[in-house]
């Protein structure tokens, strides 16, 4: 084996061993110490991050494209299934970022969940969640990818429903599973089609063998899978509902694991899509609709976690647009930069919520730049990075995506929606900054504000460095397969920045204006549309089940019971026997003359018959 390949393989196996050791310890009969979460789980992730830097530095210094390590797992007559790990610039760059972000989240969780009696189990779930995502990222075949895919799905169910004493948490966990089941159907159907027509689940072999095949059907299945997992329009309601889970779960779910898995699947499969206009157009339109719709929903939310959740869905829509542009490397760049500031925004939200007696309504916050200056600073940096402020992490990916959209020969509808959504991003980001950090406090004076804890400060500090410099570092080291357009008109170059500034100014004006309310209620229709999340949950969770139940009741009670069973059962027999019974009963009228006449007629007939 080549030394470089040996280095990659041994690093990955060592990383998995370090992460799996704390999990295996939990299966023993020995009770875990109270500090197991910080001494084992957090340390394991930190060590794995440091180990992952070795293959990353080697990869960047040697300029290698990809290394694959395979072990035969199962051999059948038509299909070989291998345990195969792929080291390319997607997995090599993403794994350290995922570990870095998770390390910060786990350290924060030691403070956030310190009073939970089952904190060790919580950390075990988080660690399993991370391992499943790393399996998905490093998989070189669809079967192995599917194991990671299902792993993040089931762990999200357990983590979202962590506080299972609350009905809302159970409902949210069930929603996450059911919506993801729809996506899983797409992935399974796509895998079945590929196994039938290509006879391989190995990613490289699929790319080679499928060149002369029409790949529309399996690609539609993969897009459905990504729609469910990455909460695209139509299968998106589970994502804001998932905020019922603890804040560290939300941070991990939205930054570097669950929701980016769908986009990562499409990035992995992008060579299958690059010549399929149906799939690319569908991704483009679906992403544009998602980013616009969820940004609109975020405008009027008052729950700080739900605003950040909708911003995630909006950014996932932007990544889907990028895949529709046939620029998967830009989508990957946005995944990497987005992980830093999105995790930081959630951790800041968790810090604020804990400091204000579990208050999540931004209207009941304010003035935190005096009381919690570090958290407020990180919240501001994260919101500005999300907006695409120049030279913060989000700028490098977001600006490149909108430039690519501006210079592509695609429909202007997607471009328009994306630019409006970018402006809306600036509006709700500034709204969070304005209501949470600025002005005067609007909460009870007894709130135990305390950010002077290393378990709060250190994770935020690390993620803030990532939010400031992460975009530049990833941008300098990522290999862009396609050369971007190097010349363009100034108005196109400045379009993303212009709409962001416009959004910021609009938000500032609106926030200042609405600090004194002139009307009793806002404009009913647009406000109601945004607050009710576009009426999608009402239609999917209320109208459709109500229609199904009503239809079922009508079929069961009226059509089957009152119509079919009545007409063919008791009533049918009664209707058949009634004429005969009526004719028979008419003959017995109680008149002696009639009876004597009938008797005589019968006697005559019998005599005649016997005589013959």
Swiss-Prot record:
GO terms for molecular function: NADH dehydrogenase (ubiquinone) activity. One of its GO terms (cellular component) is mitochondrial inner membrane. InterPro entries: NADH_DH_su5_C, NADHpl_OxRdtase_5_subgr, ND/Mrp_TM, NU5C-like, Proton_antipo_N. Coiled coil: none annotated. GO terms for biological process: ATP synthesis coupled electron transport; electron transport coupled proton transport. Keywords: Electron transport, Membrane, Mitochondrion, Mitochondrion inner membrane, NAD, Respiratory chain, Translocase, Transmembrane, Transmembrane helix, Transport, Ubiquinone. It is found in: Mitochondrion inner membrane. Its main location: mitochondrion. It catalyses: a ubiquinone + NADH + 5 H(+)(in) = a ubiquinol + NAD(+) + 4 H(+)(out). The chain crosses the membrane at residues 12-32, 48-68, 92-112, 117-137, 142-162, 176-196, 247-267, 279-299, 307-327, 330-350, 376-396, 419-439, 463-483, 494-514, 591-611. Its EC number is 7.1.1.2. It is a multi-pass membrane protein. Core subunit of the mitochondrial membrane respiratory chain NADH dehydrogenase (Complex I) that is believed to belong to the minimal assembly required for catalysis. Complex I functions in the transfer of electrons from NADH to the respiratory chain. The immediate electron acceptor for the enzyme is believed to be ubiquinone. Belongs to the complex I subunit 5 family. This is NADH-ubiquinone oxidoreductase chain 5. The gene is MT-ND5.
